[in-house]
Amino acid sequence: MKPSIAIILCILILGVDSQRWVQFMKEAGQGSRDMWRAYSDMKKANWKNSDKYFHARGNYDAARRGPGGAWAAKVISDAREAVQKFTGHGAEDSRADQFANEWGRSGKDPNHFRPAGLPKRY
């Protein structure tokens, strides 16, 4: 099925008005950028035990964009964890990452996971 036909079906069947669909896609794009920014900051910071903070922060920022941002954060987070599981990385660490992801997406303060001494710019 062509993407354009799928979009039209969604609009007709689900009753999604076109402006809301455009807004959802805009939020998803912005949420994706929020997730990328958190990942980039995590790599730049290179701070021990900070990954859970950046997971929570990326999801938090993306979800604040709206339903599209929350959707993008979930898709990106789940894909990342699926890749880790496939490559054989620790299941326990993956569960902890998912907990931090859900914490951020639910609107809870990502600073709960902030490690001591992490520079304020992050």
Curated annotation (Swiss-Prot):
Gene Ontology process terms (BP): acute-phase response; cell chemotaxis; cellular response to interleukin-1; response to bacterium; response to stilbenoid
A family per Pfam: SAA
Region (Disordered): 87-122
UniProt entry keywords in alphabetical sequence: Acute phase, HDL, Secreted, Signal
Segment forming the signal sequence: 1-18
One annotated GO molecular function: Toll-like receptor 4 binding
Induction: Upon cytokine stimulation.
Tagged with keyword Glycosyltransferase: no
GO CC entries: extracellular space; high-density lipoprotein particle
Family membership noted in the UniProt record: Belongs to the SAA family.
Function: Major acute phase reactant. Apolipoprotein of the HDL complex. In vitro exhibits antimicrobial activity against Escherichia coli, Streptococcus uberis and Pseudomonas aeruginosa.
Cited PANTHER family: SERUM AMYLOID A, SERUM AMYLOID A PROTEIN
Protein name (database record): Serum amyloid A-3 protein
Annotated source species: Mus musculus (Mouse)
